[in-house]
């Protein structure tokens, strides 16, 4: 293990917090470390590994610099650029999933900082909120939707129709907030920025490897897909493999183990046993609250054991993606890629009010809209 890798872990406060939480939970549940590897969602870990390699490959190719230069020339004001990036993040998340959308828009946003004066952290926060709002529209936008859609019996179009009111309300709210938080002042460009030199061969290689990886995911052969992607970069551009933030994978592994330990707590098991008897407001608040603690995908998996895949459930777990950092794994991905500690607390200044508003508006819509 390299010294830079160790130094990164030593400075990673969130990872250290997860370790401390895991140690604390171990005192209240049976100590069975042999079961911990099974608690890790290896499909997610492998998928993230491939996406991180591919994104880093495009970044090191210099293509984001080329694309960023074209973008800043097209948008005259900070507000227009921010609105475009938020809409792009939301749109991409509807068919590429929220995580993949972030792996595209966040590196591009970071590149824009070198070309012009923009509040990068604020824009990344809005992009994280945008993929949570946009991805809830379609059955393939995020993992919780995939799970519930598979059990609901709804058609693709039918699922979109039931999610459209909430998605529309959240996107309208986010765009209005974006309009208020990003000024309409003219873009200020950095002087002396050299014309970017990019590597077309590496870009095309990334595109080819991306197609291979997506095909492998489609056929449930994600491990072989990762092997091919890693081998390709090892041969073509070894720097890509060495530049990836591999500590993010350890953070996810620690989160999965902590969630596993948390669900073993007798108190939580007792609460879950009564979920099927809750009223609609009670289930709404329970699903949202549980998502804040263990993330919305594990919450969905747990709750589907006790309640049917209803409209209320799918809306609640998607609303639960806002708020606290653990609400959605997409939040963690976006903030980690920003590589700035200040963004962690600033994120909650926007995300928590968004959660409260989404919980209120979502439940009102459930009450006033005709039942499906």
Curated annotation (Swiss-Prot):
GO terms for cellular component: plasma membrane. It holds the Pfam family CitMHS. Its main location: membrane. The chain crosses the membrane at residues 14-34, 35-55, 86-106, 123-143, 156-176, 209-229, 248-268, 284-304, 310-330, 349-369. It comes from the Bacteria. It is a multi-pass membrane protein. CDD domains: YbiR_permease. Keywords: Cell inner membrane, Cell membrane, Membrane, Transmembrane, Transmembrane helix, Transport. Residues 107-122, 177-208, 269-283, 331-348 are cytoplasmic. It is found in: Cell inner membrane. Residues 1-13, 56-85, 144-155, 230-247, 305-309, 370-372 are periplasmic. Coiled coil: none annotated. GO terms for biological process: transmembrane transport. Belongs to the CitM (TC 2.A.11) transporter family. This is Inner membrane protein YbiR. It comes from Escherichia coli (strain K12). The gene is ybiR.
């Amino acid at each position: 293990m390299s010294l830079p890798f160790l130094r990164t872990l030593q400075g990673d406060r969130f990872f250290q917090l997860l370790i401390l939480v895991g140690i604390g939970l171990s005192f209240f549940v049976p100590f069975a470390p042999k079961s911990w590897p099974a608690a890790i969602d290896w499909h997610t870990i492998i998928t993230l590994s491939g996406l991180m390699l591919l994104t880093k490959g495009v970044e090191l190719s210099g293509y984001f610099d080329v694309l960023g230069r074209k973008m800043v020339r097209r948008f005259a004001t900070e507000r227009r650029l921010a609105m475009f990036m938020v809409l792009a993040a939301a749109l991409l998340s509807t068919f590429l999933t929220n995580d993949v959308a972030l792996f595209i828009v966040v590196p591009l946003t970071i590149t824009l900082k070198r070309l012009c004066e923009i509040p990068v952290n604020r824009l990344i926060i809005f992009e994280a909120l945008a993929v949570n709002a946009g991805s809830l529209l379609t059955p393939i936008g995020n993992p919780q939707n995939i799970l519930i859609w598979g059990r609901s019996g709804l058609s693709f179009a039918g699922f979109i129709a039931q999610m459209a009111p909430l998605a529309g309300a959240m996107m309208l709210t986010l765009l209005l907030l974006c309009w208020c938080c990003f000024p309409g002042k003219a873009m200020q460009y950095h002087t002396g920025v050299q014309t970017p030199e990019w590597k077309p061969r590496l870009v095309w290689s990334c595109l080819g490897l991306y197609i291979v990886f997506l095909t492998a995911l489609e056929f449930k052969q994600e491990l072989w897909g990762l092997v091919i992607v890693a081998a390709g970069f090892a041969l073509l551009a070894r720097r890509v493999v060495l530049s990836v933030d591999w500590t993010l994978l350890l953070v996810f592994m620690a989160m999965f183990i902590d969630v596993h330990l948390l669900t073993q707590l007798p108190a939580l098991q007792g609460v879950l046993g009564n979920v099927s008897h809750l009223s609609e407001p009670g289930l709404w608040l329970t699903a949202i609250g549980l998502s804040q603690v263990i993330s919305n995908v594990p919450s969905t998996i747990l709750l589907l054991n006790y309640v049917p895949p209803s409209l209320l459930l799918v809306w609640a777990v998607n609303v639960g993606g806002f708020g606290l950092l653990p609400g959605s794994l997409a939040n963690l991905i976006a903030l980690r890629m920003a590589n700035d500690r200040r963004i962690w607390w600033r994120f909650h200044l926007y995300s928590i009010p968004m959660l409260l508003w989404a919980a209120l508006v979502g439940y009102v819509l459930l009450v006033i809209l005709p039942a499906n």
